[in-house]
Amino acid sequence: MVLAGAALVTSGVAMGPVAKYAVQYPEMFSTDYPTWAAWADLLLPVLCGAWLLYYGGRAFKGFGMQRQKLGSPLFAGTVPLYFLWKLIWRFQFTPASVYRMPCALRVLSAAAALLFAVVLIKVFLVPGLPCGHTLYAAGTGAYLLCTGLELPQTLFEAAHNMLTLPDLAAGLGIGLLGLCGLFCAWEACGEEME
């Protein structure tokens, strides 16, 4: 969670010059990428990454084992909001074509990240709620789609200089969130009983 949060904060900070340019020259931005979208690309990954950094750090300190409420739902709402934004943003570029399969896979990984983020927030904000099966299913799906599809595709496109820094950091963040899903699915299984 901490590494995914750091990558998402980097993605948001890298969008800073674009948001600044959008404020200075709004006439340069068309209806395809409005000014408010530049600000959403700046603020949402920073807030989502900050939440993942903060609660990932708290989980390392042992707060995850205690049965207490871990945070405010208002700040936690930025996590699924960011992944919903990524899902919508990626879905608009996916035409019905086999040649655009990488774009379609990115849509699926954003949907898996959104589902896992919602389940993760449910675990953090409502302690003691029996949701092991849901956490296992969402964590496994996030691992398969985010780490199994998004991360190799991001690394391939980065190796061929096809990505900008914000897209690279967002892809790495979503891929690392899938590793967090694997860890959560592993922990949701519990200890082996004989």
Model-predicted segments: where are they?
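Short helix-loop boundary/capping segments
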Residues: 75-81, 85-90, 100-120
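Membrane-interface helix-loop-helix junctions at boundaries between adjacent transmembrane segments
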Residues: 1-43, 58-69
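C-terminal transmembrane-bundle signature of multipass membrane proteins
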Residues: 103-194
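Alpha-helical transmembrane segments of polytopic membrane proteins
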Residues: 1-4, 11-12, 33-51, 102-114, ...
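Membrane-interface helix-boundary motifs at transmembrane edges
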Residues: 59-72, 123-133
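Juxtamembrane "helix-exit" motif on the non-cytosolic side of transmembrane helices
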Residues: 13-28, 86-98, 150-161
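Canonical alpha-helical transmembrane segments
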Residues: 51-61, 114-123
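Transmembrane alpha-helical segments of multi-pass membrane proteins
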Residues: 1-10, 69-85, 134-145
